[in-house]
Amino acid sequence: MAKQIALPRSQTSPLFQWRAYYEMTKPKVVALMLLTVLVGMCLAVPGTVPLVPLIAGMAGIGMMAGSAAAFNHLIDRRIDGLMARTYNRPLPKGRISIIKAISFASILGTLGFIILYALVNPLTAWLTFASLIGYAVVYTAYLKRATPQNIVVGGLAGAMPPLLGWTAVTGEFHGNALLLVIIIFAWTPPHFWALAIHRKAEYAKVDIPMLPVTHGVEFTKTCIFLYTVLLAIACLLPVLVGMCGPVYLVSSTLLSAGFIYKAWQLKFHETPGLAMNVFKFSIYHLMLLFIALLVDHYLWV
């Protein structure tokens, strides 16, 4: 186990401590996730989303997502300290003790669950709890270290937010919400595999069997390209069932074409930094795609 690091007094101040807790929630990841939750809520109703499910749902789901991220930090603290991308995280640096981190993650998740159960509905509370377990336990603690298909199988937990938003408003499952889940499920592998190519040596160093480590970079590039094509097809499903109109169709087509082009470049060109470019583009792809869903919905209601 890594030795606890002695920190300057400024780094043990309450303000610095709260910044460390905030960092443990992976705020940028949660923000993108909450965008997909919001879109799920808005697409579930023809008009304005009711205020209580909107506020309580976003708060509760966000808190439980932050809790899952904090548990991820806890479980991965050893390997995080050995990887250049993550060695500055609060736990490897000793900015937060393990006991405090466990308490923080547990309290945050519990409060989020209570908010969802009491103010939204039990279905959303339990689905969000299942997503937390899927990400923090099934993926982080087991799949990540067990199989190169970790991100494919474990990606289902990360694809749930639009469904959570939908059930928060309606209290029931709907096929249209599952189409949004399919989109994120197909988006997840090329997103993470691009990062895994860029960080291949680091994953190999800590014995994490990411696809580039176990099957090679070229095979992973091929998989990324094939998954971007699969994603492009998945992005058309909302149009095919009449859920979306021309604004989304044009937007998703352009975004899919851009993602496929980036993946093609990655596969057939050896330009340095292309894998990281694909990773960054994938983030904008998902963000803009869900914004297009939102705009299209309110233009064509």
Curated annotation (Swiss-Prot):
It is a multi-pass membrane protein. This is Protoheme IX farnesyltransferase. The gene is cyoE. The keyword ATP-binding does not apply. Carbon 2 of the heme B porphyrin ring is defined according to the Fischer nomenclature. Belongs to the UbiA prenyltransferase family. Protoheme IX farnesyltransferase subfamily. Its EC number is 2.5.1.141. It is found in: Cell inner membrane. InterPro entries: Protohaem_IX_farnesylTrfase, UbiA_prenyltransferase, UbiA_prenylTrfase_CS, UbiA_sf. The keyword Cell inner membrane applies. The chain crosses the membrane at residues 29-49, 51-71, 96-116, 123-143, 151-171, 177-197, 223-243, 244-264, 281-301. One of its GO terms (biological process) is heme O biosynthetic process. Pfam families: UbiA (PF01040). It catalyses: heme b + (2E,6E)-farnesyl diphosphate + H2O = Fe(II)-heme o + diphosphate. Keywords: Cell inner membrane, Cell membrane, Heme biosynthesis, Membrane, Transferase, Transmembrane, Transmembrane helix. GO terms for molecular function: protoheme IX farnesyltransferase activity. Pathway: Porphyrin-containing compound metabolism; heme O biosynthesis; heme O from protoheme: step 1/1. It comes from Shewanella pealeana (strain ATCC 700345 / ANG-SQ1). Converts heme B (protoheme IX) to heme O by substitution of the vinyl group on carbon 2 of heme B porphyrin ring with a hydroxyethyl farnesyl side group. GO terms for cellular component: plasma membrane.
